[in-house]
Regions:
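Short helix-coil boundary/hinge micro-motifs
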Residues: 1-242, 273-277, 281-296, 304, ...
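Short linear motifs in low-complexity, proline-biased tails and propeptides
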Residues: 323-329
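Cysteine-rich micro-motifs
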Residues: 247-267
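Extracellular/mature segments of secreted proteins
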Residues: 261-262, 272-274
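Short loop/turn segments at secondary-structure transitions that flank enzyme active sites
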Residues: 241, 259, 270
Length: 341
Protein backbone atom coordinates (compact mmCIF):
# COMPACT_ATOMS: atom_id res chain seq x y z
CA UNK A 1 0.00 0.00 0.00
CA UNK A 2 1.00 3.61 -0.60
CA UNK A 3 -1.02 5.06 2.30
CA UNK A 4 -0.27 3.86 5.83
CA UNK A 5 -2.73 1.00 6.30
CA UNK A 6 -4.08 1.46 9.83
CA UNK A 7 -4.57 5.20 10.17
CA UNK A 8 -6.50 6.73 13.05
CA UNK A 9 -7.68 10.27 13.74
CA UNK A 10 -8.65 11.49 17.18
CA UNK A 11 -9.63 14.71 18.89
CA UNK A 12 -9.97 15.70 22.52
CA UNK A 13 -10.05 18.78 24.75
CA UNK A 14 -7.65 19.14 27.68
CA UNK A 15 -8.48 20.44 31.15
CA UNK A 16 -6.66 23.66 30.18
CA UNK A 17 -9.16 24.20 27.33
CA UNK A 18 -6.73 23.21 24.61
CA UNK A 19 -7.91 21.26 21.59
CA UNK A 20 -5.73 18.37 20.46
CA UNK A 21 -5.78 16.80 16.98
CA UNK A 22 -3.81 13.70 16.01
CA UNK A 23 -3.53 11.64 12.81
CA UNK A 24 -1.36 8.57 13.20
CA UNK A 25 -0.59 5.09 11.89
CA UNK A 26 -1.22 2.11 14.19
CA UNK A 27 0.66 -0.45 12.06
CA UNK A 28 3.03 -2.41 14.31
CA UNK A 29 6.65 -1.84 13.39
CA UNK A 30 6.01 1.34 11.40
CA UNK A 31 3.87 3.46 13.69
CA UNK A 32 4.09 7.18 12.93
CA UNK A 33 2.32 10.43 13.75
CA UNK A 34 1.44 12.57 10.72
CA UNK A 35 -0.50 15.37 12.39
CA UNK A 36 -0.31 16.44 16.01
CA UNK A 37 -1.64 19.86 16.91
CA UNK A 38 -2.51 21.40 20.27
CA UNK A 39 -3.94 24.92 20.40
CA UNK A 40 -6.51 27.06 22.23
CA UNK A 41 -9.98 25.54 22.11
CA UNK A 42 -11.95 27.10 19.26
CA UNK A 43 -8.91 28.28 17.30
CA UNK A 44 -9.81 25.86 14.51
CA UNK A 45 -13.20 27.63 14.25
CA UNK A 46 -11.41 30.97 13.90
CA UNK A 47 -9.21 29.43 11.21
CA UNK A 48 -12.29 28.15 9.37
CA UNK A 49 -13.57 31.75 9.45
CA UNK A 50 -10.34 33.46 8.37
CA UNK A 51 -8.68 31.07 5.93
CA UNK A 52 -9.05 31.35 2.17
CA UNK A 53 -9.61 27.73 1.12
CA UNK A 54 -9.67 28.36 -2.64
CA UNK A 55 -6.47 26.39 -3.28
CA UNK A 56 -7.66 23.60 -0.99
CA UNK A 57 -10.94 23.33 -2.91
CA UNK A 58 -8.94 22.98 -6.14
CA UNK A 59 -6.96 20.13 -4.58
CA UNK A 60 -10.18 18.46 -3.38
CA UNK A 61 -11.56 18.65 -6.92
CA UNK A 62 -8.44 16.91 -8.24
CA UNK A 63 -8.71 14.26 -5.51
CA UNK A 64 -12.31 13.52 -6.51
CA UNK A 65 -11.31 13.06 -10.14
CA UNK A 66 -8.53 10.64 -9.20
CA UNK A 67 -10.78 8.63 -6.86
CA UNK A 68 -13.25 8.09 -9.69
CA UNK A 69 -10.60 6.89 -12.17
CA UNK A 70 -8.79 3.55 -12.41
CA UNK A 71 -6.78 2.85 -9.25
CA UNK A 72 -3.08 2.04 -9.59
CA UNK A 73 0.02 2.76 -7.54
CA UNK A 74 0.70 6.02 -9.37
CA UNK A 75 -2.83 7.24 -8.63
CA UNK A 76 -2.55 6.40 -4.93
CA UNK A 77 0.84 8.11 -4.71
CA UNK A 78 -0.67 11.21 -6.27
CA UNK A 79 -3.59 11.07 -3.81
CA UNK A 80 -1.14 10.85 -0.91
CA UNK A 81 0.87 13.80 -2.27
CA UNK A 82 -2.29 15.87 -2.65
CA UNK A 83 -4.03 15.04 0.62
CA UNK A 84 -1.28 15.00 3.25
CA UNK A 85 -0.24 18.70 2.87
CA UNK A 86 -3.87 19.73 3.41
CA UNK A 87 -3.46 18.78 7.08
CA UNK A 88 -1.16 21.80 7.43
CA UNK A 89 -3.87 24.05 5.98
CA UNK A 90 -6.41 22.93 8.59
CA UNK A 91 -6.60 19.89 10.91
CA UNK A 92 -10.10 19.09 9.60
CA UNK A 93 -8.43 17.59 6.52
CA UNK A 94 -7.00 14.82 8.71
CA UNK A 95 -10.14 12.63 8.44
CA UNK A 96 -9.87 12.84 4.63
CA UNK A 97 -6.38 11.30 4.69
CA UNK A 98 -7.63 8.57 7.02
CA UNK A 99 -10.57 7.84 4.69
CA UNK A 100 -8.31 7.64 1.62
CA UNK A 101 -6.12 5.15 3.49
CA UNK A 102 -9.20 3.08 4.32
CA UNK A 103 -10.31 3.23 0.68
CA UNK A 104 -6.94 2.06 -0.66
CA UNK A 105 -6.90 -0.78 1.87
CA UNK A 106 -10.33 -1.95 0.68
CA UNK A 107 -9.13 -2.00 -2.93
CA UNK A 108 -5.89 -3.76 -1.98
CA UNK A 109 -7.73 -6.55 -0.15
CA UNK A 110 -10.53 -6.91 -2.74
CA UNK A 111 -13.14 -5.68 -0.27
CA UNK A 112 -16.21 -3.57 -0.98
CA UNK A 113 -14.87 -0.05 -1.47
CA UNK A 114 -17.22 2.83 -0.79
CA UNK A 115 -15.80 6.20 -1.86
CA UNK A 116 -18.91 8.15 -0.81
CA UNK A 117 -17.27 9.83 2.20
CA UNK A 118 -14.27 10.95 0.14
CA UNK A 119 -16.41 12.18 -2.76
CA UNK A 120 -18.70 14.17 -0.45
CA UNK A 121 -15.83 15.66 1.58
CA UNK A 122 -15.50 18.87 -0.47
CA UNK A 123 -19.21 19.71 -0.17
CA UNK A 124 -19.24 18.78 3.52
CA UNK A 125 -16.20 20.94 4.21
CA UNK A 126 -17.69 23.90 2.35
CA UNK A 127 -20.89 23.56 4.41
CA UNK A 128 -18.82 23.37 7.59
CA UNK A 129 -17.03 26.63 6.72
CA UNK A 130 -20.35 28.39 6.15
CA UNK A 131 -21.84 26.96 9.33
CA UNK A 132 -18.78 27.97 11.36
CA UNK A 133 -19.03 31.57 10.16
CA UNK A 134 -22.67 31.81 11.26
CA UNK A 135 -21.82 29.99 14.50
CA UNK A 136 -19.16 32.57 15.37
CA UNK A 137 -21.06 35.68 14.29
CA UNK A 138 -24.49 34.78 15.64
CA UNK A 139 -23.98 32.26 18.45
CA UNK A 140 -20.55 32.40 20.12
CA UNK A 141 -20.04 36.17 19.89
CA UNK A 142 -21.72 37.09 23.18
CA UNK A 143 -21.88 40.75 22.12
CA UNK A 144 -24.39 39.88 19.42
CA UNK A 145 -27.82 40.03 21.09
CA UNK A 146 -26.18 40.16 24.56
CA UNK A 147 -29.55 39.81 26.30
CA UNK A 148 -29.94 36.34 24.70
CA UNK A 149 -28.37 33.16 26.07
CA UNK A 150 -26.11 31.10 23.80
CA UNK A 151 -28.93 28.56 23.35
CA UNK A 152 -31.35 31.33 22.34
CA UNK A 153 -28.89 32.81 19.84
CA UNK A 154 -28.35 29.32 18.41
CA UNK A 155 -32.11 28.81 18.05
CA UNK A 156 -32.51 32.19 16.33
CA UNK A 157 -29.71 31.37 13.90
CA UNK A 158 -31.57 28.16 13.03
CA UNK A 159 -34.83 30.04 12.52
CA UNK A 160 -33.01 32.45 10.20
CA UNK A 161 -31.63 29.46 8.21
CA UNK A 162 -28.03 30.62 8.73
CA UNK A 163 -26.73 27.28 10.04
CA UNK A 164 -26.16 24.45 7.58
CA UNK A 165 -26.82 21.47 9.85
CA UNK A 166 -29.93 20.51 11.80
CA UNK A 167 -28.22 18.39 14.44
CA UNK A 168 -24.92 17.92 16.26
CA UNK A 169 -24.46 14.16 16.09
CA UNK A 170 -20.98 12.73 16.01
CA UNK A 171 -19.04 9.46 15.88
CA UNK A 172 -17.43 7.21 18.43
CA UNK A 173 -16.63 8.67 21.85
CA UNK A 174 -14.38 6.96 24.36
CA UNK A 175 -12.89 7.88 27.72
CA UNK A 176 -9.22 6.97 27.56
CA UNK A 177 -6.01 7.37 29.50
CA UNK A 178 -4.04 9.61 27.17
CA UNK A 179 -0.25 9.89 27.24
CA UNK A 180 0.42 13.63 27.44
CA UNK A 181 4.15 13.33 26.77
CA UNK A 182 4.21 10.45 24.29
CA UNK A 183 3.47 9.94 20.59
CA UNK A 184 -0.18 9.86 19.56
CA UNK A 185 0.00 6.30 18.26
CA UNK A 186 1.18 4.93 21.63
CA UNK A 187 -1.02 3.83 24.52
CA UNK A 188 -0.50 3.98 28.27
CA UNK A 189 -1.84 0.43 28.51
CA UNK A 190 1.43 -0.84 27.00
CA UNK A 191 3.43 0.30 30.04
CA UNK A 192 3.43 -0.06 33.80
CA UNK A 193 2.86 2.95 36.04
CA UNK A 194 6.44 2.62 37.30
CA UNK A 195 7.90 2.69 33.78
CA UNK A 196 5.85 5.73 32.77
CA UNK A 197 6.95 7.58 35.90
CA UNK A 198 10.55 6.59 35.31
CA UNK A 199 10.35 8.06 31.79
CA UNK A 200 8.59 11.19 33.03
CA UNK A 201 5.49 10.53 30.91
CA UNK A 202 2.28 12.02 32.30
CA UNK A 203 -1.17 10.59 31.57
CA UNK A 204 -4.73 11.85 32.00
CA UNK A 205 -8.25 10.58 31.40
CA UNK A 206 -9.83 12.33 28.42
CA UNK A 207 -13.06 12.06 26.46
CA UNK A 208 -11.71 11.19 23.01
CA UNK A 209 -13.58 11.46 19.72
CA UNK A 210 -12.83 9.09 16.84
CA UNK A 211 -14.77 10.74 13.99
CA UNK A 212 -16.07 8.69 11.09
CA UNK A 213 -16.48 11.82 8.98
CA UNK A 214 -15.39 15.45 9.08
CA UNK A 215 -19.00 16.29 10.00
CA UNK A 216 -18.58 14.19 13.16
CA UNK A 217 -15.49 16.19 14.08
CA UNK A 218 -17.12 19.56 13.46
CA UNK A 219 -20.38 18.65 15.21
CA UNK A 220 -18.54 17.50 18.33
CA UNK A 221 -16.43 20.66 18.48
CA UNK A 222 -19.45 22.84 17.76
CA UNK A 223 -21.51 21.19 20.51
CA UNK A 224 -18.62 21.44 22.98
CA UNK A 225 -18.14 25.17 22.35
CA UNK A 226 -21.88 25.88 22.58
CA UNK A 227 -22.24 24.00 25.86
CA UNK A 228 -19.41 25.86 27.61
CA UNK A 229 -20.19 28.43 26.08
CA UNK A 230 -16.93 29.53 24.44
CA UNK A 231 -16.87 33.35 24.10
CA UNK A 232 -15.58 34.80 20.84
CA UNK A 233 -15.16 38.54 20.23
CA UNK A 234 -14.33 40.71 17.24
CA UNK A 235 -11.09 42.66 17.73
CA UNK A 236 -11.78 46.39 17.85
CA UNK A 237 -8.47 47.08 16.15
CA UNK A 238 -8.10 44.61 13.24
CA UNK A 239 -11.75 43.52 13.03
CA UNK A 240 -10.95 39.78 13.14
CA UNK A 241 -12.53 37.30 15.55
CA UNK A 242 -10.57 35.73 18.41
CA UNK A 243 -11.23 33.30 21.24
CA UNK A 244 -11.49 34.99 24.63
CA UNK A 245 -9.12 33.10 26.92
CA UNK A 246 -9.04 35.37 29.95
CA UNK A 247 -10.99 38.48 30.85
CA UNK A 248 -14.47 38.15 29.35
CA UNK A 249 -14.42 41.87 28.48
CA UNK A 250 -11.42 41.56 26.14
CA UNK A 251 -11.71 43.86 23.11
CA UNK A 252 -8.41 43.18 21.34
CA UNK A 253 -6.70 40.06 19.99
CA UNK A 254 -3.06 39.03 20.36
CA UNK A 255 -2.25 39.06 16.62
CA UNK A 256 0.67 41.21 15.51
CA UNK A 257 -0.44 44.39 13.80
CA UNK A 258 0.58 44.61 10.16
CA UNK A 259 4.01 46.20 9.86
CA UNK A 260 4.44 46.38 13.63
CA UNK A 261 5.98 44.37 16.45
CA UNK A 262 3.05 45.27 18.69
CA UNK A 263 -0.09 43.19 19.04
CA UNK A 264 -3.59 44.58 18.71
CA UNK A 265 -4.00 44.09 22.47
CA UNK A 266 -0.87 46.09 23.24
CA UNK A 267 -1.88 48.88 20.87
CA UNK A 268 -5.46 48.68 22.05
CA UNK A 269 -4.37 49.53 25.58
CA UNK A 270 -2.65 52.65 24.24
CA UNK A 271 -5.75 53.61 22.23
CA UNK A 272 -7.98 53.11 25.27
CA UNK A 273 -5.68 55.26 27.40
CA UNK A 274 -5.60 58.01 24.79
CA UNK A 275 -9.38 57.82 24.43
CA UNK A 276 -9.87 58.23 28.18
CA UNK A 277 -7.40 61.09 28.23
CA UNK A 278 -9.07 62.88 25.33
CA UNK A 279 -12.36 62.92 27.23
CA UNK A 280 -10.73 65.37 29.63
CA UNK A 281 -11.05 68.96 28.31
CA UNK A 282 -7.58 69.87 29.62
CA UNK A 283 -6.05 67.07 27.56
CA UNK A 284 -8.00 68.12 24.47
CA UNK A 285 -6.82 71.73 24.80
CA UNK A 286 -3.23 70.60 25.37
CA UNK A 287 -3.34 68.39 22.24
CA UNK A 288 -4.77 71.24 20.16
CA UNK A 289 -2.06 73.66 21.27
CA UNK A 290 0.70 71.04 21.03
CA UNK A 291 -0.11 70.46 17.35
CA UNK A 292 -0.14 74.20 16.68
CA UNK A 293 3.24 74.76 18.35
CA UNK A 294 4.75 71.71 16.64
CA UNK A 295 3.66 73.18 13.29
CA UNK A 296 5.62 76.35 14.10
CA UNK A 297 8.81 74.26 14.33
CA UNK A 298 8.13 72.83 10.87
CA UNK A 299 7.47 76.32 9.48
CA UNK A 300 10.61 77.75 11.11
CA UNK A 301 8.84 80.26 13.38
CA UNK A 302 9.85 78.40 16.54
CA UNK A 303 13.10 76.60 17.36
CA UNK A 304 13.22 73.02 18.62
CA UNK A 305 14.72 74.22 21.89
CA UNK A 306 11.87 76.70 22.38
CA UNK A 307 9.32 73.98 21.57
CA UNK A 308 10.91 71.55 24.05
CA UNK A 309 10.82 74.16 26.81
CA UNK A 310 7.22 75.12 25.99
CA UNK A 311 6.16 71.46 25.88
CA UNK A 312 7.65 70.77 29.33
CA UNK A 313 5.80 73.70 30.89
CA UNK A 314 2.57 72.88 29.03
CA UNK A 315 2.59 69.30 30.34
CA UNK A 316 3.11 70.50 33.89
CA UNK A 317 0.20 72.94 33.60
CA UNK A 318 -1.97 70.27 31.92
CA UNK A 319 -1.34 67.87 34.81
CA UNK A 320 -2.10 70.63 37.30
CA UNK A 321 -5.37 71.37 35.49
CA UNK A 322 -6.37 67.69 35.45
CA UNK A 323 -5.59 67.52 39.18
CA UNK A 324 -7.80 70.56 39.83
CA UNK A 325 -4.94 72.81 40.88
CA UNK A 326 -5.36 75.10 37.85
CA UNK A 327 -8.65 76.19 36.33
CA UNK A 328 -9.40 75.24 32.72
CA UNK A 329 -9.91 78.91 31.83
CA UNK A 330 -6.46 79.88 33.16
CA UNK A 331 -4.87 76.90 31.40
CA UNK A 332 -6.45 77.77 28.04
CA UNK A 333 -5.48 81.43 28.50
CA UNK A 334 -1.86 80.40 29.06
CA UNK A 335 -1.89 78.09 26.03
CA UNK A 336 -3.20 80.92 23.84
CA UNK A 337 -1.01 83.62 25.36
CA UNK A 338 1.61 83.32 22.61
CA UNK A 339 -0.88 82.75 19.81
CA UNK A 340 0.41 84.06 16.51
CA UNK A 341 -1.80 86.41 14.57
Amino acid sequence: MVFPEHMEFRYYVTSERKEHFALYDRTLGSRMTYLELTQDLGQCLIDLYDTDFYDAYCVLSEINKLVQTEKNEAAWRKLLELSMPLCKVHPFFGPLVKELSKLESAYAHDQDADAAIVLSFANDFEDIVRDAKALIERCLDDRYQPDYSTAERYREAHYDALLRFDDMRYGELATEEVMLDGPAYDSAYHYSVELLRERGIRTALREVLYPNTVRDLYNYLKAYCLRLPLPIHKCKNCGRYFVVTGNITQDYCTRLMEGSEKTCRQMGAVVQYQSRQMKNPATREFTRSYKAHNARVRYGTMTKAEFTAWSKTAREKRDACVAGKLSLEDFVAWLDSDKQR
